[in-house]
C-alpha cells in the first residue's frame, strides 16, 4: 500500500494560478522550485487537448530561468491541429508575467493493432518491491521535492555511474486531484534523471539542466516510474543525462536533459 505523506500537494489551484507549497522546492535554492512539478503542470494542460484516439508522443521543456517558489500561471495554444499529428505549445509564467518555462508537445493519433512490431528485448529493472529505499545525498531538510517523492534503487550505486531508480509521488500534483494521472507522475519525476545518475560530485559542482525532452512510444500506466539513467559530462562544462523510462508493465520511452556543469564556490 502506498505510504501516506503529511507533506502538502505540490500546488493548490487558486483561480487560474497554481500556488506552490514547500514540496516543490528544488535542490539549488530554497527560493526556487524543482523543474519537475511545474513541467507536470504543463503536461496536465496539454493533456486536456488530447482526444481518446491520440497520445502525447513527445514533450520538450526549455527552462528559461529558475522557477520561483511563488504562484504560477499556465498558458497553452494549438500550433497545428492535424488529423494524425497535432502540435501544441505552452508557457509557465511567473507572477511578474515573465516566462520561466516554454514547452512544445507532439500529439499523435493511435490505432490499436495497426502495425506489427517486435517485442522489446531490454531486460526490465527489478520491480519497486524488490528495490531498496534510498535518498539523494545532496538534498536535505524536512521539506522539499526530495521528501515529496519516494525513491527506490533498482540497479547500480548512486554516485558511481549509471543507476536505475523507481520514483513515485507521495503527494498529489494539484490539491484535490487524486490520483495524479500517470503522465503527470512521469513528467514530475523525469527531470530527476540527472540527480539519479550524477556526473559530478554535488558537493563540488552543480549540474543544472537547461531543458528536458521526453519521448513516449506508449502512454504510461500507474504511479511508479523507473529512470534507468546515465550521465556524461565534459570538462568544458556541458553534460547530457539520458534515461530509459519504465512503468511497472514495461518500457515507456526515453528522456534527455542538457546540463550546465559548474564548480561550486570553494569547490
Question: What does each model-identified segment do?
Answer:
Residues 1-267:
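Terminal targeting signals and extreme-terminal segments of soluble enzymes
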Amino acid at each position: 500500500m502506498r505510504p501516506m505523506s503529511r507533506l502538502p500537494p505540490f500546488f493548490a489551484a487558486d483561480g487560474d494560478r497554481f500556488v506552490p507549497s514547500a514540496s516543490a522546492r528544488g535542490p539549488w535554492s530554497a527560493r526556487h522550485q524543482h523543474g519537475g512539478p511545474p513541467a507536470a503542470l504543463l503536461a496536465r494542460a496539454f493533456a486536456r487537448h488530447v482526444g481518446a484516439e491520440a497520445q502525447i508522443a513527445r514533450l520538450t521543456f526549455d527552462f528559461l530561468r529558475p522557477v520561483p517558489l511563488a504562484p504560477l500561471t499556465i498558458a497553452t495554444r494549438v500550433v497545428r491541429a492535424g488529423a494524425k499529428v497535432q502540435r501544441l505549445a505552452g508557457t509557465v509564467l511567473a507572477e511578474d508575467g515573465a516566462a520561466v518555462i516554454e514547452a512544445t508537445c507532439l500529439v499523435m493519433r493511435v490505432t490499436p493493432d495497426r502495425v506489427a512490431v517486435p517485442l522489446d528485448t531490454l531486460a526490465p529493472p527489478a520491480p519497486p518491491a524488490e528495490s531498496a529505499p534510498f535518498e539523494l545525498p545532496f538534498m536535505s531538510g524536512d521539506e522539499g521535492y526530495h521528501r515529496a517523492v519516494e525513491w527506490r534503487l533498482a540497479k547500480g550505486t548512486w554516485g558511481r555511474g549509471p543507476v536505475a531508480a523507481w520514483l513515485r509521488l507521495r503527494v498529489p500534483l494539484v490539491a484535490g486531484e487524486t490520483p495524479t494521472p500517470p503522465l503527470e507522475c512521469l513528467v514530475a519525476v523525469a527531470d530527476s534523471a540527472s540527480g539519479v545518475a550524477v556526473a559530478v560530485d554535488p558537493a563540488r559542482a552543480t549540474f543544472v539542466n537547461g531543458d528536458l525532452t521526453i519521448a513516449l512510444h506508449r502512454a504510461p500506466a500507474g504511479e511508479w516510474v523507473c529512470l534507468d539513467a546515465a550521465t556524461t559530462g565534459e570538462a568544458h562544462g556541458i553534460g547530457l543525462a539520458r534515461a530509459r523510462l519504465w512503468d511497472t508493465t514495461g518500457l515507456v520511452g526515453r528522456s534527455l536533459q542538457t546540463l550546465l556543469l559548474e564548480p561550486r564556490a570553494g569547490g
